[in-house]
Regions:
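A short glycine-rich, His/Asp/Glu-containing loop-to-beta-strand
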Residues: 6-42, 98
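Short histidine-centered beta-strand/loop micro-motifs
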Residues: 19-21, 39-45, 86-88, 107-108
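Short, conserved beta-strand element in jelly-roll/cupin
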Residues: 33-35, 45-60
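Histidine-centered metal-chelating micro-motifs
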Residues: 39-40, 59, 75, 79-84
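Structural motif
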Residues: 57-59, 66, 82, 92
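Short acidic-glycine-tyrosine-enriched beta hairpin
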Residues: 65-79
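Ligand-binding loop in jelly-roll beta-barrel domains
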Residues: 79-104
């Protein structure tokens, strides 16, 4: 069992990274803080992902569908499905991304 503080996790790019492999669990989580206009390129993961929007507004593309997602929105991304998000609001975007894998694996498209 571990008790951690968010600030103890490494901050890489735009997120604090909870890497399951380092914590002895089979999933990973990323606490994202994205500035307006910021987001990753279109990409895939070999596992499923669930994104919980906590604050702000994101434009999220999953496969061929693009939607605006606001605080409280949840997006499920199947494994190997192209997806991306961008902070489309005027304030910071905060979201928690849960990856169904013990380490981060991403293929940019």
């Amino acid at each position: 069992m571990s008790f951690l503080n968010l600030e103890e996790l490494p901050f890489v790019g735009m997120s604090h990274e909870f890497v399951g492999e380092k914590q002895g669990v089979p999933f990973s989580a990323y606490v994202v803080t994205a500035k307006p206009g910021q987001g990753p390129p279109l990409h895939t993961h070999p596992y499923s992902e669930v994104a919980f929007t906590i604050e702000g507004t994101a434009t999220i593309t999953v496969g061929d569908e693009t939607r605006e997602v606001k605080a409280g929105g949840i997006v499920v991304v199947p494994a190997n499905t192209p997806h991306r998000f961008v902070n489309s609001g005027k304030t910071p975007l905060r979201q928690i991304d849960i990856h169904a894998g013990p380490k981060f694996v991403q293929s940019n498209l």
